[in-house]
Amino acid sequence: MVAIPAVLLRVDAELGYRWQAWFNDSFEYLQNTVHFKLDPTRASGYSIWLKILQPFHSYAVVTILQHLMGLAVAVMVYALARHRGARPWLATLAAVPVLYDGFEIQLEHLIMADIPLLFLLVLATTMVLWNPAGPSLRTCALAGLLLGLADCIRAIGLPLLAVFAVYMIIRRVSWRKVAAAIVVCLLPVVAYAGVFDLEHGQLAMSDATGVFLYSRVMTFADCPKMNVPVDELWLCTVVPSAQRPIAQAYIWTTPSPLDRYKPPQFAAAPNQLAENFAIRAIEAQPLDYAKAVADDTWRAFGWNRVVFPNAATYDEYLFNPHSLPIPSWDNDPSLGKYHSFAAAYIQGNPLTDVVAPFANVVRVYERHVYLPGTVYGLILLVGLGGLVLAWRRLGGEALLPWTISLALVVIPSATAEFDYRYVLPAVPFACLAAVMAFSPGTEGGRWLRRLAGRPHQDPRIPEPSGSAGSAGSAGSRSAGVSGVPSSASAPAVGSGDDQRDLATDGT
């Protein structure tokens, strides 16, 4: 019942904004889809997904599937929380943000890779955490495959593979299972890199990681402190750090030193030079780098959404009263303008049709109903408190979703720049971690019961009703024909965490 209004909101978004919303990156994904090539700027797994759906010639099919993925994420969060012992109301509460956040609904409506990425990551997490006794070999392999596919969508799958691998080692999962996850994860990644090598002459996922890291350090890089070699001096700037623009300006705008490089900066040679320069800046100014990352990450926890990185980008995260124009610029003029292949994908007009009154409803809803960043931060703190209580088990099962949530926010700030759309996929993991950390049977759950003055009670053992009839029937069920008291005859039932602590083989 809780999900029904969330479904209706997504139906309203489809009817009000027919049949998609646009972000600048959307058109590069479509360019790569129509011409079926791997983008040197970013991983093109989402373009491959769009290519699979292209025979429908419909953006409605794309966005409806993404709305369904968003709903599926909520279902998985609820199901996993309940399966690991959370009360129904608490599991429901964990799923509410992804169901009802207005910005989440708008993100699902964008032709962007974030929702498929979120779906794959939540599915992998659910698979790994589902069995209290630990994941099987097949489960680890499938989770690894999902992470590999996620890395082909956005270059965050491999860092998160490290998170999964460390978690499984902490939970004493066998090395064979950890190896299976890693090897299977690398299969789609290596295949993608091989095709990229054929197209661009570089065994990599893109020719942009160095460029983006360069943009990160250019907010503070001081060349006199860095011992810059001659071939990298052209990457320096004389503008004082206090007067420099935001990080992304050093990628996309003409004043950027990278703009001097011909051919374009998204090629193997300039990307490598930019990466060398960035690493040099981090090594020479580690505290400045840490401050830049911390300042950007802190934006995720503000109560209000301030306009960032600029008004044009901020507006693309809103349901607007009018259809936004398709940009006239293009990152590869030889292939044609963005409007041409946005139209080619559906063989029709690619402009969003804004239809009242449906558009009015979801537009007003988005402005007022969303999870403030401060609340997201508090949820993270709740999860962290549960991890601290479970310090003897290094955080327990909640460690995995909590670490994923934090990584999804910190990694973009550390490698490029903060963006609001990177926060939304982090929220379900934070909610899941907080609920799992304080579920009955965990250290957090036992702490809550002690705080309330109640003894520990496993969630799978029913509470005594206190009535004579109930007590009698309960006693007869437990004693059976043998007459053995229930305390002696009932097997010890512990939580998944307790069972694992007693197991001789945690694999």
Task: Mark where each language-model region is.
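Transmembrane signal-anchor helices characteristic of membrane glycosylation enzymes that use polyprenol
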Residues: 1-21, 100, 185-195
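Extracytoplasmic catalytic/substrate-binding loops of multi-pass membrane glycan-assembly enzymes
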Residues: 12-29, 37-60, 205-206
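Multi-pass, polyprenyl lipid-linked donor-dependent membrane glycosyltransferases
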Residues: 24, 62-71, 96-128, 137-138, ...
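Transmembrane alpha-helices of multi-pass, membrane-embedded glycan-processing enzymes
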Residues: 50-57, 62-76, 117-120, 372-383, ...
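Transmembrane-helix signature of polytopic, membrane-embedded enzymes
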Residues: 77-100, 115-119, 132, 137-140, ...
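Membrane-interface alpha helices of multi-pass inner-membrane proteins
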Residues: 140-154, 165, 185-192
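Perimembrane helix-loop-helix junctions
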Residues: 160-186
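Membrane-proximal stem/loop segments at transmembrane-domain junctions that anchor or position
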Residues: 206-348
